[in-house]
Amino acid sequence: RALAPRPAVAVRCQEGQLAVTVRRDLFGTGRPVRAAELSLGTASCPPLSPNSAQAFVTFVAALHECGSTLQVTPDSLIYRTTLFYKPTPSGNPLIVRATPAEVLIECHYPRKSNVSSGAVHPTWAPFRSTVAAQERLRFSLRLMDDDWSRERLSNSFQLGDSLRFQADVTSEGHVPLRLFVDQCVATVSPDRSSSPRYAFIDLGGCLVDGRADDTGSAFVSPRPRPESLRFLVDAFKFAGDAGNLLYISCHLRVTPVAQAPNPWNKACSFSKASGLWAPLEGTAAICSCCDTGSCPSPG
């Protein structure tokens, strides 16, 4: 018989204290939160000596500690406190990749026995992403399922998810073509020049979002074919924006397959392992301008 997975937050109400166990993969996205981003109560009590290698973080506190409150009812004593998740700000102040969360915790102590609060499964509200591509020839830009086998049926995502984009061009009747993405911009309105705006691909093919410490955004290697290009972008939203809709517009271009990639036509991802920009095809030199920001404008 398969064991049920442990809940994201579990509470044990003991005789004079409570113990809270928090799964580091708090939201079930596969991206663990940092122990330092978690605290208990209004007094911001830290967890017990956290170990980054462990899958769980534990808090232990006396019932009256960490700013807890007590309610006395005819049948019970009810101690209340709150688990806070306050994500570390992104390196880019324009965007956020995680939103704060609060989990209310209660311990009920009846006259003859005690009970623990039920398991809590916090979630983020999803936001929707609407994709539009500038069309030249017959271009398309699609959100794909996790295995890239078909177009994703839903445009709803949660922070912590990865967005899988596939760009294509239909090249019948043309010389063999290679597709590139010059720029992709996210906005909160259909106007790609509106503000706020965030260019996560820029400089003629640099996936600049992958440069941030908290992302795994990158072009996918190898291509399925020269006229297709896949890339991953970690889900995000604009800081301070109460809406749940993003518009993504990308500028696509093609070159003949016979033409080698160059600083004008490139697909460059930042490698966290090497600390360097790496091209999907071509020599490393074509990506050097991604660091300097002096890439030549595509023709």
State the predicted function of each range:
Residues 1-299:
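Long, disordered, Ser/Thr/Pro-rich
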